[in-house]
Amino acid sequence: MPKRILQGKVVSDKNEQTVTVLVERRFKHPLLHKTVRSSKKYRAHDADNQFKVGDTVRIVECAPISKTKRWTVLTETAEVSA
């Protein structure tokens, strides 16, 4: 089974070797026919404490590291400025 990869924004880096990543997804509501935004927070392992609040990162699923951590930070994605 392939590992899931998600992209989100770091909203907290207060814990040692852990960041909280907010992942937002958009989908069309089947009845209302409008775009709905849904978000979820994931706790991800950051071994080197290199990611800060506001960074856009990619996280990948992994074996459980602790009670709440099931994800590892892969890379930081570059922000595209318009």
Swiss-Prot record:
GO annotation terms (biological process): translation
A molecular function (GO) term: rRNA binding
HAMAP family attached to this UniProt entry: Ribosomal_uS17_B (MF_01345_B)
SUPFAM superfamilies named among the record's database cross-references: Nucleic acid-binding proteins (SSF50249)
UniProt keyword list: Ribonucleoprotein, Ribosomal protein, RNA-binding, rRNA-binding
Keyword RNA-binding: yes
Subunit structure: Part of the 30S ribosomal subunit.
Name by which UniProt lists this protein: Small ribosomal subunit protein uS17
Protein family (similarity comment): Belongs to the universal ribosomal protein uS17 family.
Domain of life, source organism: Bacteria
UniProt xrefs under InterPro entries: NA-bd_OB-fold, Ribosomal_uS17, Ribosomal_uS17_bact/chlr
NCBIfam families: PRK05610.1, uS17_bact
Biological role: One of the primary rRNA binding proteins, it binds specifically to the 5'-end of 16S ribosomal RNA.
A GO CC term assigned to this protein in UniProt: cytosolic small ribosomal subunit
